[in-house]
Design a protein with these regions (language model features):
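Gly/Ser/Thr-rich phosphate-binding loops and adjoining beta-strand/alpha-helix segments
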Residues: 3-6, 21-53, 69-83, 158, ...
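Acyl-group handling in specialized metabolite and lipid biosynthesis
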Residues: 28-32, 39-45, 94-108, 189
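Acyl activation and transfer enzymes in specialized metabolism, enriched
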Residues: 39-64, 178-197
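Short amphipathic C-terminal alpha-helix that caps PH/PH-like domains
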Residues: 58, 111-118, 197-205
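Hydrophobic/aromatic-rich structural module bridging two neighboring secondary-structure elements via a short loop
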Residues: 63-100
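Helical lid/core segments from catalytic subdomains that handle acyl or acyl-like groups
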Residues: 91-147
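Histidine-centered acyl-transfer/condensation active-site motif
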Residues: 131-144, 162-198
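Flexible helix-coil linker/hinge segments at domain or subdomain boundaries
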Residues: 204-212
């Protein structure tokens, strides 16, 4: 998927782009509890894989925010029509490998294809991000911990791939809450864009049957 190049002369955040690019740590990171009660119920009732169902929800919420599909390339900005996910897959020896998935299909079509791809990469594990790492959302999961903040390793110089991390969900009364972290490069992404991701994820998790 070849991205389009943005016209920086018409880009409304040009000053902010230049400002945050100068910083040693240009990342902004927000963790929020997402209500996944209905989504969790759907996975239980239909016997669906929980992580992959949450992944599909999150990646489609991220793809609905144009700023999260933008990447810094050289001195400019490119924007993808949609981005793929690259998530960690646990291996029997305690390490992990990466698995790249396209979440554009409906949930019902996505899950069997995703399960097959996870099985394939576990048989031949690799940390290769593929031909175009820029088109990826980096996704991790800490199902052992319910966290309220997280710090992630990032490269130098800074990249511009958003990072999404899930924690251990908790039951609070009749609600199921999942801690979700979104880390993004502030040269491209501001507070309203972060909020749009979380709003989109909760909306999808509240009505998961609409995306099946």
């Amino acid at each position: 998927m070849e991205p389009r190049t943005l016209d920086l002369a018409a880009y409304p955040r040009r000053a902010h782009f230049d400002y945050f690019r100068q910083m040693a740590n240009p990342y902004v990171s927000v963790t929020a509890p997402c209500d996944i009660t209905a989504l969790r119920r759907l996975t239980q009732e239909r016997g669906l894989p929980f992580f992959l169902t949450v992944l599909h929800c999150a990646i489609n919420a991220a793809n609905a925010v144009p700023e999260l599909r933008q990447r810094i390339r050289g001195e400019g900005i490119v924007e993808y029509d949609r981005c793929l996910s690259s998530h960690t897959v646990a291996l029997p020896d305690g390490t992990y490998c990466y698995c790249t998935l396209d979440c554009a299909q409906s949930l019902g079509a996505f899950l069997p294809a995703a399960q097959a791809e996870v099985a394939r990469v576990k048989a031949a594990p690799s940390l290769d991000d593929g031909a175009d790492p820029d088109e990826l959302f980096f996704v991790s999961s800490l199902p052992w911990l319910t966290f309220s903040a997280i710090s992630l390793p990032t490269p130098t110089p800074a990249d511009s791939n958003p990072r999404i991390t899930f924690g251990k969900f908790t039951q609070e009364g009749d609600r199921v809450l999942l801690p979700v972290n979104l880390t993004a490069n502030h040269a491209l992404v501001d507070g309203p864009h972060l909020a749009a991701f979380f709003d989109g994820m909760v909306q999808r998790a509240t009505h998961p049957e609409e995306y099946f």
